[in-house]
Amino acid sequence: MNLPKRIFIKTFGCQMNEYDSSRMLDMLQAAEGMQTTDNPEEADVILLNTCSVREKAQEKVFSHLGRFAPLKEKNPDLVIGVGGCVASQEGESIVARAPYVDVVFGPQTLHRLPDMIESKRRTGISQVDISFPEVEKFDHLPPPRVEGAAAFLSIMEGCSKYCTFCVVPYTRGDEVSRPFDDILTEAIQLAEQGVKEITLLGQNVNGYRSETADGEMADLALLIEYLAEIPEIERIRYTTSHPNEMTPALIDCYARIPKLVSHLHLPVQAGSDRVLMNMKRNYTVLQYKSIIRKLRAARPDICISSDFIVGFPGETEQDFEATMKLMRDVGFDFSFSFIYSPRPGTPASYLPDDCSPEEKQSRLSRLQALNEAQGKAISASMVGSIQRVLIESVSAKRADELAGRTDNNRIVNFPGDTALINQFVNVRITEALSHTLRGELV
């Protein structure tokens, strides 16, 4: 009897990549009956799904590939593939530098992966396809297969904002939205498998625009309204959004649709209008704060998290202090902050940068300390409250406890029976720790 082939997938970066990796697995399971393995040494196929947002992304990929080279020498039939945004950037140069790589594919061509693997096996020639065939990939993917009550659902690809620091438009292409009815179909398929919470994904997810079957123009607000009508779907999230796409209709969803969670990740990047202009964000601090005010009017308990870039070229101490002020004024929940690192080929990479690495690190530490204090204060304010929690798994810290997620995206650990996994329960919060909560079933 032939044993099923095994696949090892290493995923870097964002939730879009996590979604794409799950769809790669769906395809190869459908095509070849593959099973996953956590051990690359026993794999028949090794895939790296890469991210190019952070510094030295390419070198990290080649470092991992170098570890797999001896496995290829030992087993010439092993298939090694590189996908994702680094694949889009590097293309043929990946094979030139690492000739043992068999397939290179971009985010928009992952649906061709089974055919590319078959072509490599048949011809012995490495296959490279990093084209941008819009949403063709969604037409060729099998129905999703999920385990657990929470799932990702990709609704659009790419970004057309062209912020000066960002490589995404060059690696994932311009914005392309999936057909409205296709998204509803996938959501229903997920619900039929027991999914209760969906997270809608896109690089600029609230820029979603498509048409319904009757020709009505649909945006993210309308999509959320329709998804909320699926009885089994009890909770809806979306990420990542752009402030300029927070339309009145979308903000109004927070007042009308309880299934839409009381948490929003809304990247601001900086608190200085001058820096925002140089980043080509196309909004001001005042406009951003106005959006937050409207969101809190619609949903008073909403938690707002964000992204911040520290040390952008030309950032002065005054600019940075403006970012600190914005952090305090908005009261951001736990957020992501990074020192600026130039992405090759982006406009910002050509800007003069006279801020020392030491000063950038100092600014980052100050910003993160403030944000940490604010996040902890929000957690502390939840002690004594009763939260609706979707139980996801056994706790990573204690085998006799469960772990779940609140509406506002907090992890809660509490004693409970494993039979409750994938269910919603009410939990009284008893303690706020550094980045998690403790509680008890009500």
Curated annotation (Swiss-Prot):
Annotated catalysed reactions: N(6)-dimethylallyladenosine(37) in tRNA + (sulfur carrier)-SH + AH2 + 2 S-adenosyl-L-methionine = 2-methylsulfanyl-N(6)-dimethylallyladenosine(37) in tRNA + (sulfur carrier)-H + 5'-deoxyadenosine + L-methionine + A + S-adenosyl-L-homocysteine + 2 H(+)
Superkingdom of the organism of origin: Bacteria
Family: Belongs to the methylthiotransferase family. MiaB subfamily.
InterPro entries, per database record: Elp3/MiaA/NifB-like_rSAM, Methylthiotransferase, Methylthiotransferase_CS, Methylthiotransferase_N, Methylthiotransferase_N_sf, MiaB_methiolase, rSAM, rSAM_horseshoe
Domain TRAM: 380-442
NCBIfam families according to UniProt: miaB-methiolase, MiaB/RimO family radical SAM methylthiotransferase
Localisation: Cytoplasm
All residue ranges annotated as the Radical SAM core domain in the record: 145-377
Cofactor note: Binds 2 [4Fe-4S] clusters. One cluster is coordinated with 3 cysteines and an exchangeable S-adenosyl-L-methionine.
Cofactor(s) annotated in UniProt: [4Fe-4S] cluster
Positions that bind [4Fe-4S] cluster 1: 14, 51, 85
Residues binding [4Fe-4S] cluster 2, per UniProt: 159, 163, 166
Cellular component terms (Gene Ontology): cytosol
Assembly mode: Monomer.
EC number of this enzyme: 2.8.4.3
GO molecular function, one term: metal ion binding
Entry keyword annotation includes Cell inner membrane: no
Function: Catalyzes the methylthiolation of N6-(dimethylallyl)adenosine (i(6)A), leading to the formation of 2-methylthio-N6-(dimethylallyl)adenosine (ms(2)i(6)A) at position 37 in tRNAs that read codons beginning with uridine.
Organism: Methylobacillus flagellatus (strain ATCC 51484 / DSM 6875 / VKM B-1610 / KT)
Name of the protein in question: tRNA-2-methylthio-N(6)-dimethylallyladenosine synthase
Entry keyword Repressor: no
Keywords: 4Fe-4S, Cytoplasm, Iron, Iron-sulfur, Metal-binding, S-adenosyl-L-methionine, Transferase, tRNA processing
Residue ranges of every copy of the MTTase N-terminal domain listed in the record: 5-122
Location (main, coarse): cytoplasm
